[in-house]
Amino acid sequence: MDLKTQENGTNRTSALIIATISSFLSSFMGSSINIALPEIEKTFSMNAITLSWVATAYLLSVAAFLVPFGKLADIYGRKKIYTIGVAAYTLSSVLCAIAFSDISMIVFRVLQGISSAMIFSTSMAILTSVFSDGERGKAFGISVSATYLGLSLGPFIGGIMTKHLGWESIFWVNLPIGVFLLYLVTKLLKGEWAEAQNEKFDYVGSLILSVSLIALMIGMSHLPMFAGFALIFGGLAGLVIFVYHQTHIHNPLLELKLFSKNRVFAMSNLAAFINYSATFAITFMMSLFLQYVKGYEVDKAGIILVAQPVVMSIFSPLAGYFSDKKEPRIVASVGMLIVTIGLGLLTFINCNTPTVAIVLYLMLLGFGFALFSSPNTNAVMSSVEKKHYGIASSILGTMRVTGQMFSMGFAMIIISLFMGKAKITPEVFPLFSKSLQTLFGIFTILCFLGVFASLNRGKVHKI
């Protein structure tokens, strides 16, 4: 083995470890922080609205900065932006652990979200840079598997840590992991990737896009109130202005031809948006259904719900491997079809549905989502030139986050239509069950349409 081959092998291994740990860390933090929220509320005597901002501030920051940092990474170097992101994430985690008030906690969570955007926009792009077309699907599968493993372990391990070590421990654990990642990226990951280094950064476009996305996401969280619809309208208007701005400058933040002339890229991102819009609220709705309608304790409900991400983590690497051998659109489309079937089955659940059946439906969903996620990522990243890797990864991440918010928005609208502002009590269990069935029915139709978007993407080619 010559020196260059050995160095390339080390780079691939280092990049895969870096992306895998990053994926696990982000999902573990997200799922474990939800378990810790009641304890955080007690520490700072927060009301419900302020407490919700501990989670919301992070999500908004990620969504607002993903695309700008993706472009900055393409211009100044993906490794550089990733390294700064890991350092900032580690520091902001420490700040969250030593937060001294509710406001300081929210501010530090904003910083954590901004630094997470730097990591999200570059980790997959770095993987794409070091793995060839025939290898990256499997690499994506391993990284995506780590995401679902974090989602599975977060509530369990996060709950234990919060109970015995305090909620601060969830943030403190990022310190040694962050230091380890910094060592890997600075000492073992060789080279830099900045194929768009001669381009200028579009600050105006970044501002317009960030404000528009924030308005959209806050609007979705306030549905079905009038303010929610107004913010969504304002966000959509901002996106129209953003598109106009991008067509009238020399170095746009976003190459619109990626959407207009690259069907694979456009349809793969649309499929991702549809998939997350149709699936993200499932865990939220099923958690309420299991605890209220079925009467299960929180730990039993958690064990049932973990079936879905566990199956995802098991089959994602296999799905990525298949997407290297077969057309990614075929594997991803089969996955979305299986998700559609799983959603259709969940549409008919009620208080008499056996627990075993619910677990099987969730496992089917997990299997379908595993088949969809990493092949779809492979299709997106393999359809663009090297200079667009950062921005492509960021756009896909933005589709994921906005899809998640749309999913929760749909859920809030349906619950409001059936139950108004009534609390979930035995008297309204039938109404809640009806709202759940209606929502899952809508999600089934949406996901079925997504199958056609996935199939219609065509074969991968670079633009």
Task: Name the predicted role of every residue range.
Residues 14-51, 55, 64-66, 282-287:
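Extracytoplasmic
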Residues 56-70, 120-124, 306-319:
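Central cavity-lining transmembrane alpha-helices of secondary-active solute carriers
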Residues 163-270, 304:
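Hydrophobic transmembrane-helix bundles of small-molecule transporters
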Residues 14-21, 33-34, 146, 165, ...:
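12-transmembrane solute porter fold
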Residues 70-204, 222, 386:
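Helix-loop-helix hairpins in multi-pass membrane proteins, especially solute transporters
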Residues 45-52, 141, 298-303, 394:
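Small-residue hotspots at the loop-to-helix junctions and early N-terminal turns
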Residues 27, 31, 97, 113-121, ...:
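Small-residue-rich segments within alpha-helical transmembrane domains of MFS-like 12-TM solute carriers
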